[in-house]
């Protein structure tokens, strides 16, 4: 437990700033808000770099968040190092707050970009989608699922490269429980890792989540990737999420594309592979090998592919047909 930071008066330096200064951080402007805290830009004087500081109020946060989701988020982020993921640097806990020091992405997020400029050219969509796919391949190869992929969680650095953020719902799948599928990687209904409680936004949720069924979190991630790719090239979500029943009906049908937009058939095919029922839905391995994806990412991540192939090996064991229900 760190030092206390509860004393705060109108005339004094805010307590969170004093705590940050003790650790060498000069806190700047607010760059984001969450349910339980605020994200600030900060300057780390010891290494002369800009960072992001997520400050979580223990008073505002629920016990479930403080005791389960926040420790899990920190645990997951500590083991991750990838150029398309927001990197974790440090966590500091005091009597009233938790401070998480993260890599700073200075270009805003992809949702803001779409709202400002509209649909992406397919070349830009391909760049951002392939970067996201490489980040997710890295996660999945480590047995980690994100479970909250959405446009606002795709941050942009100063060169407009994607950085996947917000690991608050991420989860490590136990390595002792290998993932099984058919050799085609498509019979994923037999996968051994099912989550029971939904995490994330309904607009990006796969049909099995909307139906309240246990779901495969690896495949829920790839469904969300399909929603993201569609929105990149169309500038609107593929399904109307204003009404849950309507949303569920729409996700049961094949997604359609506006006639007035020029979208390549290869791009459409990938979207259709992602936005389909779980037994036929593309895995991250399928995405890496997709013809449209390969146009933008010809160099394959060999280490991740090797690990993913090992995860998806078929098995003759009866365990293949069993489901292990895991808690959130």
UniProtKB/Swiss-Prot annotation:
Catalytic activity, as annotated: L-seryl-[protein] + ATP = O-phospho-L-seryl-[protein] + ADP + H(+); L-threonyl-[protein] + ATP = O-phospho-L-threonyl-[protein] + ADP + H(+)
Organism ancestry: Eukaryota, Metazoa, Chordata, Craniata, Vertebrata
Superkingdom in the source lineage: Eukaryota
Cofactor annotation remark: Mg(2+) and Mn(2+) were both present in the kinase buffer but Mg(2+) is likely to be the in vivo cofactor.
Domain Protein kinase, first and last residues per copy: 25-293
Organism of origin: Mus musculus
Record carries keyword Membrane: no
Name of this protein: Testis-specific serine/threonine-protein kinase 4
Entry EC number(s): 2.7.11.1
Cited InterPro entries: Kinase-like_dom_sf (IPR011009), Prot_kinase_dom (IPR000719), Protein_kinase_ATP_BS (IPR017441), Ser/Thr_kinase_AS (IPR008271), TSSK4_cat (IPR047908)
